Amino acid sequence: MATYKVTLITPDGEVSYDAPDDEYILDSAGDAGYDLPASCRAGACSTCAGKIVSGTVDQSEQSFLDDDQIEAGYVLTCIAYPQSDVTIETNKEEELY
């Protein structure tokens, strides 16, 4: 199991923590004490949406985002595993509509 540095740019500021590559970013953020927005926790809505600034994730389990949104860097943190050090802007649900 690899561990990566996850940096979250939230409306309240920037936070970083170490996350395993086999745990969803939403869950590892919660384990690290950071409360991110979430609803379905299954990749089927947009409540937990963020936008990748740098790095890569595996979000192959998601069913909500279209190809254009994924290419633009949007990510559903509830079903995304870090695959490198990654920086994500959180609270991006409004931008999807």
UniProtKB/Swiss-Prot annotation:
Q: How is the cofactor bound?
A: Binds 1 [2Fe-2S] cluster.
**Record keyword Electron transport present:** yes
Keyword Transport part of the UniProt annotation? yes
Binding-site residues for [2Fe-2S] cluster, renumbered to this chain: C40, C45, C48, C78
**Keywords on record:** 2Fe-2S, Electron transport, Iron, Iron-sulfur, Metal-binding, Transport
Q: Name one GO molecular function term.
A: metal ion binding
InterPro entries to which the protein is assigned, alphabetical: 2Fe-2S_ferredoxin-like_sf (IPR036010), 2Fe-2S_ferredoxin-type (IPR001041), 2Fe2S_fd_BS (IPR006058), Beta-grasp_dom_sf (IPR012675), Fd_pln (IPR010241)
Co-factor requirement: [2Fe-2S] cluster
Q: One of this protein's Pfam families, by short name?
A: Fer2
Specify the 2Fe-2S ferredoxin-type domain's residue ranges. 4-94
Annotated GO biological processes are:
electron transport chain
Q: Summarize subunit and interaction data from the UniProt record for this chain.
A: Forms a complex with heterodimeric ferredoxin-thioredoxin reductase (FTR) and thioredoxin.
PANTHER family, from UniProt? FERREDOXIN, FERREDOXIN-2, CHLOROPLASTIC
Q: Which family does it belong to?
A: Belongs to the 2Fe2S plant-type ferredoxin family.
Q: What does this protein do?
A: Ferredoxins are iron-sulfur proteins that transfer electrons in a wide variety of metabolic reactions.
Annotated protein name in UniProt: Ferredoxin-1
User: Which organism's genome codes for this protein?
Assistant: Picosynechococcus sp. (strain ATCC 27264 / PCC 7002 / PR-6) (Agmenellum quadruplicatum)
